[in-house]
């Protein structure tokens, strides 16, 4: 995940906010105080990793419907992390129970987290305090 500075001395500069994530990030939200929530849609896959340097293959794959990747990417594993303002992981939420998976968004509203997914038929909510 890269960070682009919008204000201050570093305005216009870009740096790495966090890397080497164990899963693929899909969406990022800020709780307006001290945490960035990152939805991790799928665990990393060695096959996908090997395709990263093959631009021609990535272009072909980008044109396929999401459903073409369901069997490879959408395990019944739910994963989200919270980062502090410096990019350090301060919370890690994981489940393999299958109740929530393929998380594409995490939003905090007061003491609740709301999880969204393109493949699940409903929104999920979790108390955090």
Predicted regions, residues:
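Sequence-structural signature of mature extracellular/luminal beta-sheet repeat domains
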Residues: 1-129
């Amino acid at each position: 995940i890269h960070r682009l500075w919008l204000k201050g001395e570093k305005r216009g500069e870009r740096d790495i906010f966090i890397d080497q994530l164990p899963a693929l990030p899909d969406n990022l939200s800020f709780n307006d105080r001290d945490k960035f929530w990152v939805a991790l849609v799928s665990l990393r896959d060695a096959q996908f990793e090997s395709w990263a340097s093959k631009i021609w293959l990535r272009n072909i794959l980008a044109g396929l419907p999401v459903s073409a990747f369901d069997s490879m990417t959408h395990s019944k594993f739910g994963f989200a992390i919270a980062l502090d303002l410096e990019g350090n992981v301060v919370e890690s939420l994981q489940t393999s129970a299958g109740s929530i998976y393929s998380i594409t968004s995490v939003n905090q509203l007061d003491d609740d987290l709301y999880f969204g997914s393109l493949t699940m038929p409903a929104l999920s909510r979790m108390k955090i305090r």
